[in-house]
Amino acid sequence: FAVAFAAPIDDEDDKIVGGYECRKNSASYQASLQSGYHFCGGSLISSTWVVSAAHCYKSRIQVRLGEHNIAVNEGTEQFIDSVKVIMHPSYNSRNLDNDIMLIKLSKPASLNSYVSTVALPSSCASSGTRCLVSGWGNLSGSSSNYPDTLRCLDLPILSSSSCNSAYPGQITSNMFCAGFMEGGKDSCQGDSGGPVVCNGQLQGVVSWGYGCAQRNKPGVYTKVCNYRSWISSTMSSN
């Protein structure tokens, strides 16, 4: 049993398979988490806070905002170091329950047309909702092929029955599945921690899966709507 995404990119991380290159700066809330290299994604939810996955934890992270091609300087980037990295207190590294983390930036990001925040969910999203996942993760489920430019994939939230049948006994109430049971399109290594945005709200964080884009093995995402109170209380107390 191989968990594909449940490690930052230097081990085995998560990436977009079967997607397309995002329109430049169209996902302006997307962050690249770096420690000398890109290892996970994140989402800017305020000028000073980024949401990612707890399995992406490092004590010191450089957050890169306004990025499209992470290999070159495009003039729109903001590089800001973390001052606090806060894993969810109930994160379970064995089953990846509560796979969510907050990063406080050392200074506020400047919000503009290249760097913007994404709204937290006003309510949970129902199955069938169409969403956008993005990241710089692996383009292939079978080999290593990491893109320089941000990739996007439109995908639906799957029913909890489909999710539970794909991963019996492994899906908690803090997870949901999204993608395509027939395979071929999925997030993958290097996408971990990145956004799943539905109707302008951050509903998911890229968490784990079995391989990438495999038949009957959709991607599994942290259910952000369950964490609104933890996010707001953590931000206000830090």
From Swiss-Prot:
One of its GO terms (cellular component) is extracellular space. Keywords: Calcium, Digestion, Disulfide bond, Hydrolase, Metal-binding, Protease, Secreted, Serine protease, Signal, Zymogen. It catalyses: Preferential cleavage: Arg-|-Xaa, Lys-|-Xaa. Binds 1 Ca(2+) ion per subunit. The record marks 186 as: Required for specificity. Residues 1-7 form the signal peptide. Its cofactor is Ca(2+). It is an enzyme of class 3 (hydrolase). Ca(2+) binds at residues 67, 69, 72, 77. Pfam families: Trypsin (PF00089). The active site is at 55 (charge relay system), 99 (charge relay system), 192 (charge relay system). Disulfide bonds join 22-152, 40-56, 124-225, 131-198, 163-177, 188-212. Its main location: secreted. It is found in: Secreted, Extracellular space. One of its GO terms (biological process) is digestion. It comes from the Eukaryota. Residues 16-236 form the Peptidase S1 domain. Its EC number is 3.4.21.4. This is Trypsin-3. It comes from Salmo salar (Atlantic salmon).
